[in-house]
Amino acid sequence: MQVSVENTTALERRLSITVPAERIETAVNKRLQQTAQKAKIAGFRPGKVPMSEIKRRFGADARQEAVGDVIQASFYEAVVEQKLNPAGSPSIEPKSLEAGKDLEYVAVFEVFPEFEVAGFDGIAIERLSAEVADSDLDNMLEILRKQNTRFEVAERAAQNEDQLNIDFVGKVDGEAFAGGSAKGTQLVLGSNRMIPGFEDGLVGAKAGEERVLNLEFPADYQNLDLAGKAAEFTVTVNSVSEPKLPELNEEFFAQFGIKETGIEGFRTEVRKNMERELRQAIKSKVKNQVMDGLLAANPIEVPKALLSNEVDRLRVQAVQQFGGNIKPDQLPAELFEEQAKRRVVLGLIVAEVVKQFDLKPDEDRVREMIQEMASAYQEPEQVVAWYYKNDQQLNEVRSVVLEEQVVDTVLQKAKVTDKAVSYEEAVKPAEAAQAD
């Protein structure tokens, strides 16, 4: 077999491969013999059909299948011989398929980029530290109470944070518009669910009262037909209900699976959850900084095949997340290309760090991570056992642990600054923290 390779771009390779005719004929004859053993032809006993008849009936198909098998096998042999690492399936261009002659074809494909990860010592990391103070715990208890707010009918005028049951009809230029009317809608004043001025205009209203609100849709309103237009809403208040926060009692604690331990037991469990969230938030922020630093220090070209595959995965995820009667390939690829490129490049960089430093998942850390996740459930032992009985889930945890070990490897050489902050700042999402 003859093989020559041409580098057409930084990542694209063009393999010209010639396979001796004898190998093709051997593969064709093998196919024909397999067919002869199974062929059922009237007038002949199974396995006794003359080869001339087999060739007449099945020769063309046998040759086509044999050529396909030889191309697949010879391509694999060629990339091994040339020490190439394909990043996707090849495009095959046949040059000569004539029977009795050598098979000639060209395979065009991309390879994985070859590089060494560098620049660890130039990465600056701010590592936060924080504790869950008693005041943080008190704030969390209030949040939990508000999340379980109940509303009771109030015989008074509406205030902010009250829940109103309303009917309304909206009109633009004297005409009702699609989506502008509803009956029996529950609306909490101050929730900002409606356009500016709508909720404010109902403060002070009582059950049975009708109010007319003259408002204007925001210029950036999502419905362009309504953006910036004046509108009139006629609103009827059916009822006014005031919020009632639940008491911190056994009934409330039971909603969270905590029984017979009282307020102190409840505070202990909530604190544990907050501390777990704090550890995860700090770890996540450090990881994001490390990954950003690796990206900046290691610009690499991405194989188009990998990028295309990742875009397709993100399309499928988007459809699964948001639903709707739409097929993944109907979503524009441009929406996902930036995210896809980041994920592909990081995947290549992380894999190279693992290779360079010969990293393997630390099984002690794997168990610790599983136990940490399991501690959020009422039966943690069962959760741990479930992970160790499911190879797919267990391997996913191993992958996460391996990424953490990559982060640790970078941190050993990066410029790390420790900073003590409040619990609230530590758990705040990175985007929100940057905006402050």
UniProtKB/Swiss-Prot annotation:
PPIase FKBP-type domain: residues covered: 161-246
Enzyme nomenclature, EC number: 5.2.1.8
Keyword check for Mitochondrion: no
A single MF term (Gene Ontology): protein folding chaperone
GO CC entries: cytoplasm
Predominant subcellular localization, coarse grouping: cytoplasm
Keywords: Cell cycle, Cell division, Chaperone, Cytoplasm, Isomerase, Rotamase
Catalytic activity as recorded in UniProt: [protein]-peptidylproline (omega=180) = [protein]-peptidylproline (omega=0)
Protein localization: Cytoplasm
Membrane-traversing stretches: none
One BP term from GO: 'de novo' cotranslational protein folding
Job description of the protein: Involved in protein export. Acts as a chaperone by maintaining the newly synthesized protein in an open conformation. Functions as a peptidyl-prolyl cis-trans isomerase.
Entry similarity comment: Belongs to the FKBP-type PPIase family. Tig subfamily.
Xref: NCBIfam families: tig
Designated name of the protein: Trigger factor
Biological source species: Pseudomonas fluorescens (strain SBW25)
Lineage of the organism: Bacteria, Pseudomonadati, Pseudomonadota, Gammaproteobacteria, Pseudomonadales
